[in-house]
Structure formats: C-alpha cells, structure tokens
A protein has these predicted regions:
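Positively charged, small/polar-rich N-terminal and surface patches that mediate targeting and assembly
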Residues: 2-139
Length: 139
C-alpha cells in the first residue's frame, strides 16, 4: 500500500508540474468583415504584403449602415442584415500589422459600412497533413 501511495503521489506531482509548461506561440487570428465588392482589392493589397493564405466566406451583418427598404412584388420589406465577406487569416505576430494594413488599404472607401477588423490571440495551429504546430503550421 505504501508503494502504491508513493506511486500515486509521484504521478500527481508530475501532472501538476506539467501544468503551465505548454509551449506558448505568438500568433494571431485576424477576422475582418468587408464589403463584397472590395474583396479583390483586399486580396491584391494582401498579396502585395506577402499575405497569401486566408479563408473567405459569406456573412450577414448590420452596424451603422442600418439596412435599407426593398420592394418585392408590391411588398416593402426592411433589410437589416447586409451582405458582407468574412476573412479569417492566421498569422505570426510579425505579420499582424502588414495584414491589417493590407485589409484597410483594400477595403477603405471612407463610407459607412467599410467593415471591421478583429485581432484575436491564437493559442495553437495544427497542420493536419504533417502534424506541425504553431508558427510552422501557419507557414
């Protein structure tokens, strides 16, 4: 029993000592919502800054634009959710500013509804094919 207790305590101590020793990566997830017609300009601006990898999806949203009235078959309806494009770009810390600058350069018209950019911390990234983790997985 004594050896069993020692073994259990040693296992618990090993587990506790490993807490907080997870590798810390310096990466960010940049999420941007832009006008659909500005997508090509944003992609071009990002390519010029050597940012080539991104996920693009359709989104609906509202903000200061507030929407508009639309008439369809004689009925007037208020459209409050407007079409947007959502970009998700995972970058290493040294690419954050150039990525944000590229999005702003391509998306800005000066009008309400140009969009928003969110920069979020990202704990990890795993390339499924190779198992690479962290900055190496982003590429």
């Amino acid at each position: 029993m004594k050896n069993g207790l020692k073994w259990a305590l040693a296992a618990l101590a090993r587990r506790l000592l490993n807490i907080g020793h997870r590798k810390v990566y310096h990466m960010k997830l940049i999420i941007a919502y832009i006008q659909p017609e500005r997508l090509n300009a944003v992609k071009q601006a990002l390519y010029e800054r050597e940012v080539y990898k991104m996920s693009v999806s359709n989104a609906l949203g509202c903000g200061q634009q507030k929407g508009y009235l639309h008439q369809y078959r004689g009925a007037i309806e208020e459209v409050t959710l407007l079409k947007k494009i959502r970009l998700a770009i995972a970058v290493n810390d040294d690419y954050v500013e150039k990525t944000v600058e590229g999005i702003v350069a391509g998306a800005r018209t000066g009008d309400i509804g140009d969009g928003k950019i969110f920069v979020l911390p990202m704990d990890d990234c795993i390339r499924i094919r190779t198992g690479e983790r962290g900055p190496e997985a982003i590429g």
